[in-house]
Amino acid sequence: MRAIIETVFDIFYLATVLTVGIRMIHGSKSGSQFKLFGLMAVVLGAGDSFHLVPRALALCTTGLENYAVPLGLGKWITSITMTVFYVLLYYVWRKRYQVEGQKNLTIAVYALSAVRVLLCMMPQNQWLTNKTSLTWGILRNVPFALLGLLIIVLFYRSAKDHSDKAFRWMWLTIVLSFGFYIPVVLWADVNPL
């Protein structure tokens, strides 16, 4: 029963996020923040599909333990697309608040992202096995968490400084996103569901 419910939910989620993202891209002006949000949705959905589709197949067939390689590859790809997602969110911030310059800030965003991707590429992560490394799970997420913290601070300060009611809680949505993500990193192998 769990396999069916989770699979139906995943199909609904992927179809929704990809459809909304594509519609936002096609319905927005070139270079607009809404086009960036659409691109973010497509990156998120496409990245998530690399681990949700193999997970659904595993749950509906022979089990997760028999799908170590496709599940690991999917988590690996998702880790990188999540990084791209936050780089795009940085550009939403720049566009929304008409930020010019800030070269050092942009360098920091790209440096943290590059370190994250580099750490994700290391074989010590053991992505393609049933037992990934908790230590490397933590290490590769340190630059990701710092990138997230940077984006949180940028949106918090800018929304406050510009009295931006529409984005006043954006920082909190990012905090919640990381709040839900951290337990997955720390305890996914303890209780893989």
Predicted regions and their residues:
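Membrane-proximal first intracellular loop
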Residues: 1-7, 19-45
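Membrane-interfacial loop-to-transmembrane alpha-helix junctions, especially the N-terminal start
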Residues: 28-43, 100-109, 162-173
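Membrane-helix boundary elements
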Residues: 111-137
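Hydrophobic transmembrane alpha-helical segments in integral membrane proteins
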Residues: 1-18, 137-141
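Extracellular/periplasmic helix-loop-helix junctions in multi-pass membrane proteins
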Residues: 130, 182-193
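Internal transmembrane alpha-helix with an interfacial aromatic "cap," most often the third helix
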Residues: 21-27, 50-67, 72-107, 118-124, ...
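A loop-to-helix transmembrane entry motif
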Residues: 6, 105-109, 130-148, 170, ...
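Hydrophobic alpha-helical membrane segments
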Residues: 44-47, 115, 143-153, 165-186
